[in-house]
Amino acid sequence: MNKKFFFFDIDGTLAVGTPGRQYIPESTKKAIHLLKEQGHFVAIATGRSYAMAVDHMRSLGFENMVSDGGNGITIDNELITIKPLDYQKCLNLIDECKEKGFIWAISPDNKTRRLAPDSRFYDFTHDVYMDTEVVEGLDPRNYDQIFKVYVACFAPEEQKLETLKELPWCRFHKEYLFVEPGDKSVGIKMMVDHFKGDYKD
């Protein structure tokens, strides 16, 4: 039997239900266990940050994960790396948000909460995906790196943000969008390379 590499997304693949109230069916856990028993390589591949995905990884019995939209790698339960977004492009976007009155927040670290300069982000979104912590006078330049930026607006308002075109982004909720890496294949290839696998598998 040829060893195969299986990568599973969390949202909408392993986890069912609405964000913030998701669960993983027992049948899914059993199927993953059977793949491992048969000698196949299994890993999570998610757009979620490491901090927002690691509990799912552990509860499902995974040891390996591609996180942060392809920019994070965990091997044998050890976080190897998370590459942040382009710092200057994030600052440019936040500056434009301030200038044009867009509500914004950031994830400057690997934690299960985002930072916002005031309560407007939560007031606008009522988001349950992750906690929003208010840091009065939040200045993104006080942080060395930025992993995600969040912009609260309804589509197609984001088209007014010229600097958004320079960054990868997606919309999972009608109230706000995520500026985050979106090419999980980058992390998947890094993982297959690490284990000296073949991409065809």
Residue ranges, per PLM feature:
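Asp-based phosphoryl-transfer active-site loop
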Residues: 2-21, 44
